[in-house]
Amino acid sequence: MKRTRRSLPANFDPVYPYDAPKPSTQPPFFNDRKGLTESSPGTLAVNISPPLTFSNLGAIKLSTGAGLILKEGKLEANIGPGLTTNQEGQITVEKDSDGLTFTSPLHKIENTVSLSIGEGLEDESGTLKVNFPSPPPPLLFSPPLAEAGGTVSLPLQESMQVTEGKLGVKPTTYSPPLQKTDQQVSLRVGPGLTVLNGQLQAVQPPATTYKEPLLETENSVSLKVGAGLAVQDGALVATPPNVTFSAPLEKNGNAVSVRVGAGLSIQGNALVATTSPTLTFAYPLIKNNNHITLSAGSGLRVSGGSLTVATGPGLSHINGTIAAVIGAGLKFENNAILAKLGNGLTIRDGAIEAVAPQPSFTPVTLWTGPDPNVNASINGTPVIRSFISLTRDSNLVTVNASFTGEGSYQSVSPTQSQFSLILEFNQFGQLMSTGNLNSTTTWGEKPWGNNTVQVQPSHTWKLCMPNREVYSTPAATLTSCGLNSIAHDGAPNRSIDCMLIINKLRGAATYTLTFRFLNFNKLSSSTVFKTDVLTFTYVGENQ
């Protein structure tokens, strides 16, 4: 007997035959198209779709959106002020409600809202329309105005300029020795010059008197020399006497000797007579009775039994040597007799000249005063109290500065952005108003005797400026800058960097000094912005 083969579904999987859900064979039986469903298999559940959903307790609830609300188990419209529902359940506007207000150009008259329109507008069949006027006639321009390519321009002469969109006259600049103070132009004069009755005149130096042996002749000073002295090639030298030697004396180099003949000899550096049956004496020896004498000629003499050189005025014997005798105003130097010069005298081209004394230099200090107010701005807001002094001594200018923050800059953090404080000066060394530390603050010269600020400009202010030839291009000095070091007792991670930038010019400035604060990320936390005293030096400007 053959066994009947069961038919299998088309998607039957003989390896995993348990994926397809099996219909429940247990009551109650249900139809999933009439509100019930099986979820999960073998479990009877209510078949719902949005806006129906289940609450956390498993109850069926209605999800509501904007404008709807459940009230006392009923779904209602969520209406606001000025709206209501009528007896038919329709949403209407309350007649006496002031929930809707209208402002000009809208107006409400009874149940009608209207729009007020002005000139250039019109209502055309319920549509707002703009009435465009007819185009105006083309513009004509007469000199000095000119039009080219739709642009109107104004030609300028050399004396005119446009600054920030405004027409003005170019400022007149003055080069040394001219200077401008207030509304006047003056001429700076140095030693030896003066201005008298509006005219530049030379100041005559005081008359110089000369004492012997100096002698003034016309515009030169000369030295009178006596016997034994002479001026050769502009130098004072001693002239030895013209000594001649006659036989038996003879000169060999620097030595004088006596030639001896018969009956004489030199023994032990002495002239002695030798035994001779007959002695004869030749000139300059002379026999007088039993004495033999030496006849000394010009320039020689016998003194104390010795033959010596006869010396005249200005010459003397010193240790067996003929030497010149010098008086006041002369000295020996390198085997020559020279004039002894005091202060204010020098030798030039062999002549003694008076030297004009060098002018003394008085140090100059420009500063903000000992305790300035908040005098520096960042982004237009005054927030930095800056103490700055510039001191010119000799050829160098020393910069001393310290800075304290106020307001939003009272403290800084590691994320603080870099910022700069800029001083800009004109050609006379006067502080301009174009920097963020400018001439509207206290600035001027410090007197020697007190701590005030003299704001009246002086020609010496230029000496405190950076030398434009040395710093023809911008130069910088970078130094570490401690913050609030006294309070933190020099703790680490409490310093930033400060860069002094010299002559980074902009605009009309002739000299600039820029203090740039950077590298705030070196701080470990927020810190009071109160810098240590910073010191810089640079080469000062010429007068």
Swiss-Prot record:
Q: What does the subunit comment say? A: Homotrimer. Interacts (via N-terminal tail region) with pentons.
Query: What pairs make up the disulfide bonds?
Result: none
Something else the entry says is: All late proteins expressed from the major late promoter are produced by alternative splicing and alternative polyadenylation of the same gene giving rise to non-overlapping ORFs. A leader sequence is present in the N-terminus of all these mRNAs and is recognized by the viral shutoff protein to provide expression although conventional translation via ribosome scanning from the cap has been shut off in the host cell.
Main localization category? virion
Role description: Forms spikes that protrude from each vertex of the icosahedral capsid. Interacts with host receptor to provide virion initial attachment to target cell. Fiber proteins are shed during virus entry, when virus is still at the cell surface.
Q: Name one GO biological process term.
A: symbiont entry into host cell
User: What name is this protein filed under?
Assistant: Fiber protein
The subcellular localization recorded is: Virion; Host nucleus
Keyword set for this entry?
Answer: Capsid protein, Host nucleus, Host-virus interaction, Late protein, Viral attachment to host adhesion receptor, Viral attachment to host cell, Virion, Virus entry into host cell
What the record says about the induction of its expression is: Expressed in the late phase of the viral replicative cycle.
Family that this chain belongs to: Belongs to the adenoviridae fiber family.
The keyword Membrane is assigned to this record: no
Entry's Gene Ontology cellular component terms: host cell nucleus; viral capsid
**Region described as Disordered:** 1-36
The UniProt comment on domains reads: The tail region anchors the fiber to penton base capsomers, whereas the shaft, built from several repeated motifs, allows the knob to protrude from the virion.
